[in-house]
């Protein structure tokens, strides 16, 4: 097993032909592709794959791309419950390419973020995807924040983040004339990108290599096929049945789940542990009015408070030229609930800001109610558990780290499933 991998990650591959049964959103495969691991026919109501990835967000799609490029003979499908890909956490975040400064040295977050940021910049250049390496200031505004800022700087150096500088008030003013601060960390390798555009590019790569993406497929059940229990030929070739809420079925040999906000529930559907549980937090953003955008030149962050799993309310540039302020973090009463029950405008909103969008992010909790800080990957038990890998906790910086995560997933899938 990959040495640093505590539990395990998801995978992907390439589809074995067009979808029978007129499934919505099905994307087929050109003829003449290599033979998959197993032969077998498709009926009008089922399709079969070597590997199925549940979840069409950036981690699932990056993993699908990585596996199909590594194993072009595998039949692999991606299942997504929405009509479009990458519409939840992937499409509702700040769009920041993180440098890797925040995370505990030697943690998966630290390693994968530093690697992933470099890989992401390279990928965007290759694909012509717009991004800006605009940098970031992490600013201490009170004297008591300076020791934490200095410790964060040392952590960044330990993690191998390049170009970090501690700067004083005069240099802060040179970079951000309207920013008040005593000391700051200058992070020149931080950037911004539209992560949904990146995810859709991963999906295009996957499909171009022969993979199939099936949207409007909300998973209701994952179980061993009855034929596999009787050891019939079909049951042995494709022993796992994935059913959706419409009663349609997919058969496969192996499953990788990258279900984001529903990672615990999908795990439980397959008979695996529901822990760690996912608690959803809604984050609301405000938008600087266009005439006030001159106040902010780049990303500006506060010194993070280690008591909380979030980085604090910050100013973030966007690819469209707008500037976001946020997010806050409040308990969401629905896993995909992007609107609060009510909203009261304040005087300051009339002056410099407009109401902005919201996002919902998944935060894992262990059985004792403690926040789970690092990436968590899991495998099940028993016959079905041996054929399933779960991404259980992939919070920020998972988008930045997505290409690096996908490489780890591809390694682990290859080893576990003996591909």
UniProtKB/Swiss-Prot annotation:
Keyword Lipid biosynthesis in annotation: no
Subcellular location: Mitochondrion
GO MF: 2-hydroxyglutarate dehydrogenase activity
InterPro entries linked: FAD-dep_OxRdtase, FAD/NAD-bd_sf
Cofactor: FAD
Family note: Belongs to the L2HGDH family.
Record NCBIfam families: PRK11728.1
Protein name, per record: L-2-hydroxyglutarate dehydrogenase, mitochondrial
Gene: L2HGDH
